[in-house]
């Protein structure tokens, strides 16, 4: 049997989504706009990075070719030399959302065919009966925020009042989410998690995808900083995913980063977390070392999204891509005959785009494996093709959604 490694660069879209206009995202392209900014010197930052976007290892897997597949336009920012056993293509999402659970579930073979619940962009954003229940059942003196807002901004705005009053900061966005920020010391981390579990139960009837604990530290608006003790409380997938199918067979699924939270810990054998992309990469490499035949390592690199996409930090996003790319040879070196490595994304978050929210984009599907023929897998009509390919590679029977491209890259289950 073989092994599979699925690395999700959270929010690393490549434009071209056929339905982008419906979301107000026509023209959004995370990769292309970062590359353009770098080429024009607009992403230079002293002691961080300079010059054109330099990601030679992802380019050698066909990232530029994937970008051309996504948009139908040329992509001149990378060279065209590809390694022999690499494959490249792009995928269009069929799930209605442009959020983290929808993207990851679809990657794992389960498109989201229902509509998530959302909160309106009003003040207050939450229904009065929900707010009352949160206060009563969560045993808090009230809540702050109750609106749409970027996370760092709302902590700056309400953090000091939160410390004085003990009221948690509750907010939302265009995603199906209710986020709760609280101070790790003054409110307490365990208390925040307990409050989020109460809220998770209360919003279940509203089909809200995630309740997210957003702890922070600091004593003033100028010093507040979110920590890496974030925890997502997600709705469980409504039917088995690739992860469930693997663990039911007896294979291990090692979740790196927030993968366990995204799947409500369904189909997960082990969770490995760390703070920051580079520490997460260390965890992914360790999981690769420990994976046995038939196992899947599923890793999410969240900083691209939370630290740079939402914050519209082009230089930071570019530097993070370059740092990630520099580590890829360490992953390549761990691949053995019969292994499959796929790099992809779950949605876009163009740091040059208006607002602070995700962008509807196609995603790259690039990768390699010793013994594979590689090649062009074209435009996949659903992210679920990724999950089906991993399933076939690991010897599972076909699932209900998606079409494997395993044969196209010369794979043999």
From Swiss-Prot:
Cofactor mode of binding and number, as noted: Binds 2 manganese ions.
Required cofactor(s): Mn(2+)
Catalysed conversion reaction: 2-deoxy-alpha-D-ribose 1-phosphate = 2-deoxy-D-ribose 5-phosphate; alpha-D-ribose 1-phosphate = D-ribose 5-phosphate
Major enzyme class: isomerase
GO MF, any single term: manganese ion binding
Residues that hold Mn(2+) 2 according to the record: 305, 310, 358
Residues binding Mn(2+) 1, per UniProt: 10, 346-347
A cellular component annotation (GO) from this entry: cytosol
E.C. no: 5.4.2.7
InterPro entries: Alkaline_phosphatase_core_sf, DeoB, Metalloenzyme, Phosphopentomutase_DeoB_cap_sf
HAMAP family in UniProt: Phosphopentomut
Family, per entry: Belongs to the phosphopentomutase family.
Name of the protein in its database record: Phosphopentomutase
Gene: deoB
């Amino acid at each position: 049997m073989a092994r599979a490694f699925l690395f999700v660069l959270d929010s690393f879209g490549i434009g071209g989504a056929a339905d982008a206009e419906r979301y107000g995202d026509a023209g959004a392209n995370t990769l292309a706009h970062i590359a353009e900014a770098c080429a024009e010197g607009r992403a230079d930052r002293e002691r961080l990075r300079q010059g054109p976007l330099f990601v030679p290892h992802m380019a050698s897997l066909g990232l530029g070719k994937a970008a051309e597949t996504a948009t139908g336009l040329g992509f001149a920012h990378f060279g065209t030399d590809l390694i022999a056993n690499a494959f490249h293509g792009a995928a269009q999402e069929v799930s209605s959302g442009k959020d983290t659970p929808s993207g990851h579930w679809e990657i794992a073979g389960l498109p989201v065919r229902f509509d998530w619940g959302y909160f309106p962009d009003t003040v207050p954003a939450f229904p009065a009966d929900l707010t009352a229940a949160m206060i009563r059942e969560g045993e808090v003196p009230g809540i702050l925020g109750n609106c749409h807002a970027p996370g760092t901004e709302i902590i700056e705005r309400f953090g000091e009042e939160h410390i004085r009053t003990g009221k948690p900061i509750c907010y939302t966005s265009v995603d199906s989410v209710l986020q709760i920020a609280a101070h790790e010391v003054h409110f307490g981390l365990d208390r925040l998690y307990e409050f989020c579990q109460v809220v998770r139960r209360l919003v279940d009837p509203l089909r809200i995808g995630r309740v997210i604990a957003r702890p922070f530290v600091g004593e003033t608006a100028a010093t507040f900083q979110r920590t890496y003790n974030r925890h997502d409380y997600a709705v469980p997938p409504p039917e088995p995913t690739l992860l469930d199918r693997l663990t039911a067979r007896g294979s291990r699924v090692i979740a790196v980063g927030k993968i366990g939270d995204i799947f409500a810990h369904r189909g997960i054998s082990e969770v490995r977390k760390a703070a920051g992309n580079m520490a997460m990469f260390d965890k992914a490499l360790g999981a690769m070392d420990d994976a046995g035949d038939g196992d899947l390592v599923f890793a999410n690199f969240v900083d691209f999204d939370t630290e740079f996409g939402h914050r519209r930090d082009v230089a930071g996003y570019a530097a993070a891509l370059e740092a990630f790319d520099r580590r890829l040879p360490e992953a390549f070196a761990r691949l053995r005959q019969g292994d499959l490595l796929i790099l992809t994304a779950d949605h876009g978050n163009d740091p040059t785009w208006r607002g602070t929210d995700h962008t509807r984009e196609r995603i790259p599907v690039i990768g390699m494996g010793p013994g594979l023929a590689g090649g062009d897998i074209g435009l996949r009509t659903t992210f679920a093709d990724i999950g089906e390919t991993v399933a076939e590679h690991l010897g599972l029977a076909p699932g209900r959604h998606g079409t494997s491209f395993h044969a196209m890259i010369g794979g043999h289950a």
